[in-house]
């Protein structure tokens, strides 16, 4: 131990009193501790030109000796940053300390409201039992424990026990007890009033101006015994006084300046148990049960459409709208299971409400499932049924079955051969089915410019009627290998053309002629309505 240097020129030294201790540790190295006491009053800041030499009790000559401890003069603390300031004004602690404002729970307004509501009921147990319970809570044993006599319970066959009085021998007189004095029977002096007396009293009260009947009956209220466990009810004035009395002392100006404005909210949250990295406003901080929820951010979900304020989405899906009438959870689960078994989406929830459709012709009501089944059956039958049978059936319905008996076209003129096929041109009132030409040649039907054009359509058969979608072939559109090309409406010629609508006369056009070609081995049925003017048909001629 050494003291500071002697004062020079009559001035006290600014170097503080220091104490250094050293000892051997477990690893062979010396451990040192230094205590530094700053001077009570420094006249001037110490000079940095002279090197400081630490003072120790003894020196250790080991090569692995740690560096001597550095002495720091602490002059105070920074109220803004919370760091330690040395005697020369430098900050010793570089790291910034976290500010925490603890929140005390002494002034809890919920406890006062709960006391006023009287949620805690009165203890109805006997006082002896309450005293025993209180002694057990304090860890004491209740004195003068008395066993209460209770009737013994026996099960099975039981026999009556003989009386324990004095046994009398046969032939002796038995002692008889004298009967006590008779107690007089209490008789109610009040007699019930007769109807005449009641009417007389009513007249007397009416003459005195008493409109309401009075009675001398008294209902006594049960007097409430003083119970310390019962909370004291507080009114607004008492609650305000308790609130003011339980408030902490106001903060000083230095404490107010020590906390920066931008860290005030975080300091309050740290006092409530919040830590860095946790989300704000969800769960209880520091608990293991809500640790995951506290760390995960809360993302607000978008409300479903047409959902009113305060209403809840009963469907359960994200953004799903509840169907009107779907109020029961059991019905929703039933609808979801039914939708999953029928091949639909399993997450569909809601009450199953089938939509009925009415056929205009037959008046029959069918559901969507039945309509889907009928469409599937129609598609299956369409592939199996022969087109000739459908042709005969349609012609029989329209009354034009006799058209097929014609053998030749009314007028048919051979214009020439194109690509080895037969080019035919003519005018007729009926159009016969196109059959493969003799010799396996392709057939081509040409229409001169300004004469006629052909509209070909396909027919889809249903149980309720025919749905026709047309393909229009105009002048200047070529048909190559059964495929319409160069037109806005493209359709397939390969197969069966079920219907040909009335021909339309073309206006003046620059196109010379158009051709409709039927390849070898293909069949085309041409059916003309009553308003048909001119059309063209190909036959085996």
Curated annotation (Swiss-Prot):
Signal peptide: none annotated. One of its GO terms (molecular function) is nucleic acid binding. Its main location: nucleus. Residues 1-90, 111-181, 285-312 are annotated as: Disordered. InterPro entries: G_patch_dom, Spp2-like, Spp2/MOS2_G-patch. The keyword ATP-binding does not apply. Residues 1-12, 164-176 have a biased composition (Basic and acidic residues). GO terms for cellular component: spliceosomal complex. It is found in: Nucleus. The keyword Nucleus applies. Residues 261-307 form the G-patch domain. Residues 13-28 have a biased composition (Low complexity). Keywords: mRNA processing, mRNA splicing, Nucleus, Spliceosome. GO terms for biological process: mRNA splicing, via spliceosome. Residues 287-297 have a biased composition (Polar residues). Involved in spliceosome maturation and the first step of pre-mRNA splicing. PANTHER family: G PATCH AND KOW-CONTAINING, G-PATCH DOMAIN AND KOW MOTIFS-CONTAINING PROTEIN. Associated with the spliceosome. Belongs to the SPP2 family. This is Pre-mRNA-splicing factor spp2. It comes from Aspergillus fumigatus (strain ATCC MYA-4609 / CBS 101355 / FGSC A1100 / Af293) (Neosartorya fumigata). The lineage of its organism: Eukaryota, Fungi, Dikarya, Ascomycota, Pezizomycotina.
